[in-house]
């Protein structure tokens, strides 16, 4: 594989994204490429060093994926979206409290607090991608937050919740990873958590390290907490959209963060 440089990557993207309606600007100070619509100025900025790292690890597929992501993102920015008639395509998504509450265009996103470690935003599913719902869109449709939340909550309950089980040191770990974009969102399905709680032999704990996984653990001994902590940290570090490296105890229909040092102390 030939060594990839910033200039080579810049030219490669410019060639792949040729479109008379796009404006492509190289931002030398940031070592980034800005791709935007000529008429509206809406667009996205790509860090060239980050893309080169992905290319070095994965080859041409990394560039192909970035090209598809840019085209899809710009397409969404240029479309008019409605909530009415799209009720079945509205879902809640979990994010960390540090996630921006405004878009780069200055639109305020709709969200509600979930736990000290998580917030719930709302997504309009568009097939290959989704758009986070903002105040302006909600106002245009004359919807309330309560109505939006009710619809999103209903839809997340309709998603499958088949899990894969793994037993480690007499503790049961269940993984939900369908890759549909809403794996972590299933933590909001209270009926599902209640079912898991009813069948648990020990303490039921839950983790959402990143958007594409939900971990449920039936902890039956002290070593289980240590395993869960290490597991959650690993998933958090690898996640495309990380949420939290902490896990939660599920008790009395509430989620309480548990602070675990990844160190197993033997009982005296």
From Swiss-Prot:
InterPro entries: DUF1444 (IPR010838). It comes from the Bacteria. Coiled coil: none annotated. Belongs to the UPF0354 family. NCBIfam families: PRK13668.1. This is UPF0354 protein OB2234. It comes from Oceanobacillus iheyensis (strain DSM 14371 / CIP 107618 / JCM 11309 / KCTC 3954 / HTE831).
